[in-house]
Structures are given as C-alpha cells and as structure tokens.
C-alpha cells in the first residue's frame, strides 16, 4: 500500500495532468470500485487526506480515490503519452482498458483509468462540502506537520500500555506513518519499537515527531519509496529507500550511526527493522 509520501507524490503528478481538464463521462466496469452517482465537471484541484486523494470539480462535487494495495491511476492524453501511478505492472504500457480496469474517467484532454487487481481500492463521489465529514476522512488524526509536540505526547500517554510502533501506525492517533516511515522515525529518535507509550518522555515524543516530519519530507522530495506495490505519477520509481533509508530492509547491514548489525523482527505482526544498540529496549 502506498504511504503518505507516495500519495502526495501522486497528487502532485496528477495535478499537472488533469487540473483544469473537464470530466465528461464515467464508465463503471466494477460496481464494488465505484460509490455514488457519476458526475461531470472541470477539475479545480486535487487534495490529499492521509492516503486518500480527493479530486474537486467545479460543480460542487468531489471524487475521493483510495488506491489501497494494488490500485493504479493511468492517464493517457490525446497524444497517447501515458502517465501512471500506483501498483506497478504491465498495465503501465499495455493496451487499456483491460481485465483489471474498474473505472474509466474520460476528460476533454485524455482518459484516466482506475485499475485494481484485488478490488480493494475505490472511487467515491460526494458533495465537496461533505468531504471532510466523510467517515473515512473524519477519523484521521492530524499529520505530523499539523500536530504540536505537546498534543502528540498527550496522545501517547492515553495509550501508555501500548507499544510505540503500532500506536504511531494508528491513523486516528497520527496520520500518515506507515511501516517504512515508522521504522525510520523510531530509529532517528533512538526509540525501540516495543517500548510502552507510557515510558516515552516529553522530549522523546518531541524528537519522534520531528523525526517523522524529517523522514517524510525527505521521502516526498525524493518521490517516495521504491516498493513492489508503488511507482510515481510519471511511471518512474521513488528512491527514498535507496538514498535515505537507514534501517528499513537493511537487516544484516551495519547501522549507519554505530556500526552494529541491523536486525529484523515482528512487532504487532509488522516486519520491523532496528539497530539493537541505538534503540535499546
């Protein structure tokens, strides 16, 4: 599943291609993948709420899109130049639509295909005024950039008996951190992922929040991570893992800070990477 930096990269890329273009027709090939009544209108802008994209039209309607695990957005303009984002596959270069195409959005300048192999993603039409009240979006906590260190510390103390890693993965506590960026943020802040939230000091909470901001800023700047289920809006891969990742998927390699061997184990069912020396329990 793409994480916040990947979805932000997609938002920026697609904004260049479809903002000010007019949506003229919608073809629904899978009822499960489309919620609401199809609508036409000119794209005003594209917003992001956590890992969801919202395309605002000039008719007071919006399209909320969630790629989930294997969703793709592939835009073909009239010159047949193709821009693609999401789960990488031959669909990026193959003829479209195909057996994985769930929804087709036809614009005056080209066509946007929503493909989804596993049918977990969706497009939902709703009034623009109601977007922020949608149950999926309403439950999201503030993102790291929009949360104070004091508020973050208070939230952690409300879950004092929970381990820190699954707590910061909870989108109702802090929005945007997925598995990659949780590991990287905890490493940067010298915090073991199994520590109970009640043991985290105010200083440590502030350091962790700052680390999360820095990690995600770097990832957005580099176009996101390179994972098997994600590529950028122009079809190329992000290079955060290659350029900046210090522990994620680096098990067996030396810690860039102290030289100890990075190890991998599971926390709350999630693969977790740490330096056992820098992040002692």
Predicted regions and their residues:
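Generic detection of long, well-ordered alpha-helical segments
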Residues: 1-4, 95, 146, 201-209
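Phosphate/anion-contacting hairpin/loop surfaces
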Residues: 63-176, 181-188
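A cross-family signal for N-terminal binding/gating loops and helix N-caps
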Residues: 1-115, 120, 254, 270-281
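Short acidic/polar alpha-helix capping motifs at helix-coil junctions
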Residues: 4-8, 15-18, 131-132, 220, ...
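Short, glycine- and charge-enriched coil/turn segments that flank and shape catalytic ligand pockets
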Residues: 58-60, 131-132, 203, 260
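Low-complexity, intrinsically disordered regions enriched in charged/polar residues
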Residues: 4, 63, 134, 146, ...
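Basic, nucleic-acid-binding surfaces and adjacent catalytic neighborhoods in DNA/RNA-processing proteins
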Residues: 22-38, 42, 73, 81, ...
């Amino acid at each position: 599943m793409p994480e916040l930096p990947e979805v932000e990269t997609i938002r920026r890329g697609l904004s260049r291609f479809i903002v000010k273009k007019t949506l003229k027709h919608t073809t629904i090939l899978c009822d499960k993948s489309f919620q609401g009544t199809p609508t036409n209108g000119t794209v005003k802008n594209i917003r992001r709420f956590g890992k969801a994209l919202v395309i605002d039209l000039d008719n007071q309607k919006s399209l909320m899109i969630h790629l989930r695990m294997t969703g793709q957005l592939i835009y073909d303009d009239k010159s047949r130049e193709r821009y693609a984002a999401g789960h990488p596959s031959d669909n990026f270069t193959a003829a479209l639509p195909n057996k994985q195409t769930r929804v087709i959005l036809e614009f005056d300048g080209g066509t946007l295909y929503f493909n989804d192999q596993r049918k977990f993603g969706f497009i939902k039409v709703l009034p623009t005024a109601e977007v922020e009240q949608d149950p999926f979006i309403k439950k999201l906590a503030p993102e790291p950039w929009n949360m104070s260190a004091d508020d973050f510390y208070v939230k952690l103390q409300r879950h004092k008996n929970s381990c820190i890693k699954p707590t910061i993965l909870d989108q109702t506590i802090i929005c945007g951190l997925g598995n990659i960026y949780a590991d990287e943020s905890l490493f940067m802040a010298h915090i073991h992922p199994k520590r109970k939230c009640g043991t985290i000091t105010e200083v440590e909470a502030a350091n962790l929040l700052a680390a999360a901001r820095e990690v995600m800023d770097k990832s957005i700047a580099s176009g996101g991570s390179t994972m098997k289920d994600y590529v950028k809006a122009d079809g190329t891969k992000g290079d955060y893992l290659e350029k900046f990742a210090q522990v994620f998927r680096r098990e067996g390699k030396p810690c860039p800070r102290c030289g100890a061997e990075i190890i991998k184990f599971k926390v709350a069912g999630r693969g977790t990477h740490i330096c056992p020396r820098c992040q002692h329990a």
